[in-house]
Amino acid sequence: MEELERYMKIVHYLMGIPPVRGGGMIKYATDLMIEQLRRGNDVILLIPGRVSFEKNAKCKIKKDKLYHGATVYRIDNALPVSVFNGIKDISLYTRSCDEAMVVSFFEEHKPDIFHIHTLMGLNKEWLGVAKSLKIPTVYTTHDYFGICPKGTLFKEEHVCEDSKWNTCEFCCVNAYSKKRLRIEQSKLYYFYRKNKWITGFVHKTPTIKIFKNMQALL
């Protein structure tokens, strides 16, 4: 008698899904997720959500629409997602979230494994709670964000060899402001990215700068 295959419940964390986020990491993670679903596994996607302009807004987990059959949960008011633009204000990236909220999420879903694809946007409490609940955790590093604030480990067209991080501030001189980070994780920006006719119109019309060049506004 053939041994029955054991299906798993897997929580993937990545910095977003198309059309709001794209690139190799997103392609790899979503392809993996789709294949896991095809094989009968239960897959949950956990992504950074919208950031409120309200001061001291608390993290909240909200269920979103299915993505290729996977259940999606947003962490609203999580840490900013700098992508590959560097960090200007370190305090924005070291805030804590409600540990009880994280415990509640894991206890409700009881995942067999927690698969992290980037540290961008992820509060440290997710790692601490996963460890305390003895949830096996996998980290697939698609970038260098854990050791490089730009996530590229690349400086002046060469691999950065500054092992003591003494020159990071020079690479981060053009990092996004707090206001721009919030705009790019706002409801308005999500609406913009999800509507192809709007994005196409903006990119084809040089006189419109609101979304194509937000830096000019900030």
Question: Model segments located where?
Answer:
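A conserved catalytic-core segment of Leloir-type glycosyltransferases
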Residues: 45-109, 174-183, 191-194, 198-201
